[in-house]
């Protein structure tokens, strides 16, 4: 694999907060999947996200998810591999997947709101890219 192919592949498998928000705002079929434990989801998550902890993912727990949507798993951030584990399981189950870069942490750093008992309001968009 060349370096160019590596970066092209990376963009095929990952998505950042700004691109997720733009896709959602455009009405694209994107479903955010919070792969953390239910308690973490209740404390704070991305608006519209579904709670589906990666440890519970199976054909049964994902049966209601649409096959034509892009599923975007996320977890706390770069120190957490829950979204990667979730992406693997979702791919094995036949879904189309892109992992959210930086997870919930980078979502908030980019200025987007969260919901839950520890929700934060949206701020000015911080992403400089």
Put a short name on every predicted segment.
Residues 31, 50, 98:
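Conserved beta-strand positions in the Rossmann-like core of class I SAM-dependent methyltransferases
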Residues 62-108:
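Catalytic cysteine-centered active loop of the rhodanese-like fold, especially the PTP/DSP P-loop
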Residues 57-58, 106-107, 123-124:
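Short secondary-structure capping/turn micro-motifs that flank functional sites
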Residues 41-47, 107:
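Short loop/helix-cap segments at secondary-structure boundaries that form the rim of catalytic
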Residues 1-32, 37-43, 116-129:
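Flexible, polar/low-complexity N-terminal or interdomain linker segments that lie immediately upstream
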Residues 52-60:
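Glycine-rich, highly charged phosphate/nucleotide-binding loops
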Residues 50, 68, 114-118:
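Short, hinge-like loop/turn segments at secondary-structure boundaries
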Residues 28, 94-96, 112:
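Short phosphate-binding/catalytic loops that engage adenosine nucleotides
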């Amino acid at each position: 694999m060349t370096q160019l192919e590596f970066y092209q592949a990376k963009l095929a498998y990952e998505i950042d907060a700004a691109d997720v928000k733009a896709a959602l705002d455009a009405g694209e079929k994107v479903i955010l999947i919070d792969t953390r434990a239910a308690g973490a989801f209740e404390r704070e998550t991305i608006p519209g996200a579904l709670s589906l902890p990666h440890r519970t993912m199976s054909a049964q727990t994902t049966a209601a998810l649409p096959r034509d949507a892009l599923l975007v798993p996320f977890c706390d951030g770069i120190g957490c591999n829950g979204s990667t584990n979730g992406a693997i399981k979702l791919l094995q189950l036949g879904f189309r997947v892109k992992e959210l870069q930086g997870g919930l942490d980078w979502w908030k750093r980019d200025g987007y709101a969260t919901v839950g008992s520890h929700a934060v309001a949206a701020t000015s968009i911080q992403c400089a890219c």
